[in-house]
Amino acid sequence: MKKGSITEAINAIKQFDKIVIFHHVRPDGDCLGAQQGLFHLIKANFKNKEVKCVGNNNNLFSFINMTFTNQIDESFLKEALAIVVDANYKNRIELRELLDKNLFKAVLRIDHHPNEDDLNTSFNFVEESYVACCEQIVEMATVAKWTIPPVAATLLYIGIYTDSNRFLYSNTSYRTLYLAAILYKAKADIRIVHDHLNHTSLADLKFKKYVYNHFKTQGQVIYFICTKKIQKRLRMTADQCARVNLLSNIADYKIWLFFIEQANNEIRIELRSNGINVRDIAIKYGGGGHNNASGAIITNKKQISDVVSDCVKKIVYN
């Protein structure tokens, strides 16, 4: 899927003096890196623009400072461009109530997910060939010849590094590595990123042990169900349990899944695969994503067996 262009996104940013940048709920390295990295890019290259980031990093990546301004006057919104990074539907966007006011002059979506949206966008840079939204933004900076300050470089590197699973995913490309090298040259603090992300706590170790002792299999599908009872026992939050890649690339298993029970009793599904299109399955259950990495929400535990069966059938008939 391709919608809009790099040039369209760059020109939209140039056009507005007031900008508000949004990230998605359950934030990760890519949405936060894209939001905060773009914030610093704009501040460094357009001294007169007022830029605000809304949301919350939920204490993720605490080794680097992130800026959020969640109280914004309506007078500001009426003159502003809203930029939504790494997301498409309002129910997936933190502080969506600001978008629901319908006060923004225009909306720009920058995203690498091949999904439609309900944002009523005026401008788009949607292209699924990128491994990360941060990769898109680094290319924007390169095309526009923007200065990349070290703090922006570090934030954008976080997004590329995490969303490519440390450059291991199949859609990691020459372009990905080239743009990451540009961030190296811009003095991204690579060491602090790698040290932080490769750090393992005792709680992490106990969680991994539990997963490896309690995973289940069906056909060529391997999966783990993380109930609220398990989360309480291991003293983990639902978000902390979103670790589907603990089951990645195990011989003879083409699809791996995590089912994570949420506080409201819904169950978050993380779907990953090696060469099998799991996006279709995610869409069936109201979700979406990429062919090899998608997600969805189901409403009860009885649906878990349905999802697993769909994955088994997908492999058989692939």
From Swiss-Prot:
EC number of the protein: 3.1.-.-, 3.1.3.7
Catalytic reactions of this protein: adenosine 3',5'-bisphosphate + H2O = AMP + phosphate
Keywords from the named record: Exonuclease, Hydrolase, Nuclease
UniProt protein name: Bifunctional oligoribonuclease and PAP phosphatase NrnA
Recorded phenotype for the gene knockout or disruption: Probably essential, it was not disrupted in a global transposon mutagenesis study.
Summary of the function given for this chain in its UniProt record: Bifunctional enzyme which has both oligoribonuclease and pAp-phosphatase activities. Degrades RNA and DNA oligonucleotides with a length of 5 nucleotides and shorter, with a preference for longer oligomers. Converts 3'(2')-phosphoadenosine 5'-phosphate (PAP) to AMP.
Family from the record: Belongs to the NrnA oligoribonuclease family.
Nuclease among keywords: yes
InterPro entries hit by this protein: DDH_dom, DHH_sf, DHHA1_dom, Oligoribo/pAp-PDE_c-di-AMP_PDE
Source taxonomy: Bacteria, Bacillati, Mycoplasmatota, Mycoplasmoidales, Mycoplasmoidaceae
GO molecular function: 3'(2'),5'-bisphosphate nucleotidase activity; exonuclease activity; nucleic acid binding
Gene behind the chain: nrnA
Pfam families: DHH, DHHA1
Source organism (scientific name): Mycoplasma genitalium (strain ATCC 33530 / DSM 19775 / NCTC 10195 / G37) (Mycoplasmoides genitalium)
Keyword Nuclease: yes
Alphabetized Gene3D superfamilies for the sequence: 3.10.310.30, inorganic pyrophosphatase (n-terminal core)
Needed co-factor(s): a divalent metal cation
